[in-house]
Amino acid sequence: VVITGLDDTDSQEIVLMINEYIKSDAFDISSPRLIYQGNDSDLLNMIEELKSGEISGIITAGVNPGYTLPNADDFLELVNKLEFSLCFSTKEDETANNCRYVAATPHYLESWGDYEFKTGHYYLSQPTIKPLFDTNQFQDIILTLSGSNNNFYDEIKKNWRTNILKGKTWGKSLQDGFYYSYENNAPRRIKSSLNINNLPIQNTDQLDLILYTKVGLGDGQQSSNPWLQEFPDPITRVTWDNYLTVSYKDAERLGLKNYNVSNGALNGSYVTVSNGRNSIQVPVIIQPGQTPGTVGLALGYGKTQAMSEEMNVGVNAY
């Protein structure tokens, strides 16, 4: 199977076409993944409305745009000017510390939830313990404000029985933690108008910066977890830091080096990455097999709030 982490439409279409062509057994277009369904244009429109004064209040829940947005300081400055700002959060993070009101929410291990990661693949998350503190789940608060007498658990149960289980028992699904529905999963063909011959050829004198998330740390929501910080990157084997990955060819051309010091630790060159407004300095890792003309930098590092001092590692690539 061929995969890509790029959100570029052309790249995604090329990968789909390749998997269709090689008839990959691991590739199933009839059951797509449904995660990462955010809408960047809606978010950008909201920021423009904040700037123009069309929005006088904002509520955030389970997100930290004060850390993950590009030029997040500009967003936080806009939030500070609002008449009303409320953050539902488990931590005093960058966003919470800039809102007028903060509502403490329970940890995900204290909460109910359901998910559909892939088409027809439904999952339940159950609380493992009672909430340690006097907190209310965000969904329960919304139900209360809407005048409902149900709690979020009741709504999940009702929705599963009505729209998902189709005669199967709720108790069995609760015990298993999941339910698979294979309806409407007939194989489909890919139709693409993309002309590969019209795609631009990469000029290797220029460098493309690829921002990605690591397998262990992800987007940084759990960066205060030392076990995840200690999780070695499957490719570089590096822990407790992010870095700029560079191909051998580009490293040689730019005079970048890696070397081992007396205790066996890996050391090397540092580079400055700039977007014309902000700059960050990061160590370089020369990565065998990386495509010349590309450099990679992991997101999820460089957090400064809701973190103990020893966990403040890496740079914020957002």
Per-region residue spans from a language model:
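Alpha-helical scaffold segments in soluble metabolic enzymes
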Residues: 13, 17, 45, 49, ...
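A cross-kingdom feature strongest in bacterial/archaeal respiratory oxidoreductases
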Residues: 32-36, 44-132, 160-318
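Conserved strand-helix element at the start of the C-terminal RecA-like helicase core
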Residues: 2-3
